[in-house]
Amino acid sequence: MAHKKGTGSTRNGRDSNAKRLGVKRYGGELVHPGHILVRQRGTKFHPGVNVRIGGDDTLYSVVTGIVTFERYGKWRQKVSVYPAEVAAQ
C-alpha cells in the first residue's frame, strides 16, 4: 500500500503575487513632491537630499527636482533630488 501520493500532488501549486519592487524614477528624471523613486525591501538605496523613507522602506521625493543616484560610502548608494532651478545651473 502506497503511503505517498502519486504525481500531481495537491501540495504543490501555490505562489505569492509579485510585489513590483525596484527603481520607479531613474537618474535625470524630473519628479514632484510625493513621487515614488524606489520601492524596496530593506535599504538597498538610502535617502539623500530632499528624499524621505516610508514605513515600508519606499523612497519618495519631497521637492520638485531632478533625480540623482550617488555613491554613499564604499558599498552604499543614495538617491537625492536636487531642485530643478539649482540643477539647471
From Swiss-Prot:
The keyword rRNA-binding does not apply. One of its GO terms (cellular component) is cytosolic large ribosomal subunit. Keywords: Ribonucleoprotein, Ribosomal protein. Residues 1-24 are annotated as: Disordered. GO terms for molecular function: structural constituent of ribosome. It comes from the Bacteria. One of its GO terms (biological process) is translation. It holds the Pfam family Ribosomal_L27. HAMAP family: Ribosomal_bL27 (MF_00539). Belongs to the bacterial ribosomal protein bL27 family. NCBIfam families: L27 (TIGR00062). This is Large ribosomal subunit protein bL27. The gene is rpmA.
